[in-house]
Amino acid sequence: MSEEHLIRHCAPTLAGLKTGSLFSCSFACQQELLNVLRQMNHRLLPKGVRVLPLRLSDNRALIYVYRPKKLSSDIADTVAEQILLRHGYDTAVCEKCIVRLIQRIRSQEKFPHEIGLFLGYPPEDVCGFIENKACNCKCVGCWKVYGDEEAAKRKFAQYKKCTEVYRDRWATGTDIERLTVAG
């Protein structure tokens, strides 16, 4: 996992625009990957960003980059809380939700669709996705939209622009700590 992976897949999270981001990467040695994650957390935790492996298998890692404060706020939403409670989450503590998400990812063949709540997707869109089995959405961008289509399109454009700006700034030498907004 490289800084480039983080910039390419997580710029809106690093910028403080999004609760979390998820990406997959390959690794040759699990211990080396865990060392890189430790180093990245050492650099990003002071800015309020955490990096976790949700799953490691067959030299592939599913990496979750998130802002714990934003996640705590997001899961306090009434609709989000109802979705999580239905799937066995203890919503009182953010860290317990992360542990439950990891359990669900590692133990199920089907991907847990409530993960959208951990990525900052609107709860009505996550609920719509689950209830409609990923069909009948209003539009598709970073996620499938079932609620406010115009607000979602604005977010998609904002995330795209942020990623472009971050990629350009990183390519010209701005380090990841400088690109990560404290929060």
Regions found by a protein language model. Give the residues of each.
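Short acidic alpha-helix initiation/capping motifs at coil-to-helix transition points
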Residues: I75-D77, Q103-K110, K133-A134
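A structured, charge-rich N-terminal accessory region that forms the first stable segment of a protein
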Residues: S2-S57
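Long, compositionally biased
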Residues: C142-G183
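A glycine-rich, hydrophobic loop/mini-helix early in the fold
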Residues: L37-V93
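Short helix/loop capping segments that flank catalytic or ligand/cofactor-binding pockets
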Residues: L33, S73-D74, C127
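Hydrophobic/aromatic-rich, well-ordered segments within soluble, folded domains that form packed cores
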Residues: F111-C139
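Short, surface-exposed beta-edge/turn micro-motifs
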Residues: K18-G20, N59-A61, P112-E114
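Internal catalytic-core helix/loop-beta-alpha segment
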Residues: R86-H113
